[in-house]
Amino acid sequence: MEGSRSLFIPVILGTTRQGRMSLHVSRLLTQEMAKQNGVETELIDIATVSLPTGDAGEAIKEAGFSGKMNRADGLVIVAPEYNHGYSGLLKHVLDSCLKEYIHKAVGIVGVSAGPFGGTRVIQNLLPVMREIGLVTIFWDVNFSSVQKVFAEDGKLLDESYIRRIDKFLKELIWMAKTLRQGREQISLD
């Protein structure tokens, strides 16, 4: 992206559980995103975001999350499936920023220990993404039986995921560029 600033597309890990295999997925996505030309990224692990039980939205903003979402041109959300849904803490974090999400691209990565690869969690997140103003891409990445996809040390065991991730990231980057241009050039006031 000569002559313009890089896109910023962080990867949000949407769980705080101990022993979470989705941490390996998030690290892989962050690693592959960092290889893309003209893109900056960072892994945002919600386990490291201070989430008090009071006015969590303000506390998260103070922790810099809001600033990162404001700067972001798009997002990747890595969401493990828990009983057909996503973690309450992910919802808590997503609800902490609303105006920062408007007209920004989002790609969702589903993770499960079972055969469906987080398909149900992705389906649950789609209406939430729309409601908070994010624009979903049409590619998803599903990590089925994630415990068989990564070794305990995080090494990827199934290289076919790299092709899927590449397709996903190309679509996300295209959408992030397009939406950034729209935000910068077209006023909706």
Regions found by a protein language model. Give the residues of each.
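N-terminal beta1-alpha1-beta2 submodule of the flavodoxin-like/Rossmannoid cofactor-binding fold
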Residues: 1-97, 156-189
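Repeat-unit-sized solenoid/scaffold elements
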Residues: 77-84, 109-119, 145-153, 181-185
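His-Asp phosphorelay/catalytic-motif detector in bacterial-type signaling
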Residues: 102-103
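Mobile beta-alpha loop/short-helix "lid" or hinge segments that flank ligand
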Residues: 42-52, 99, 132-152
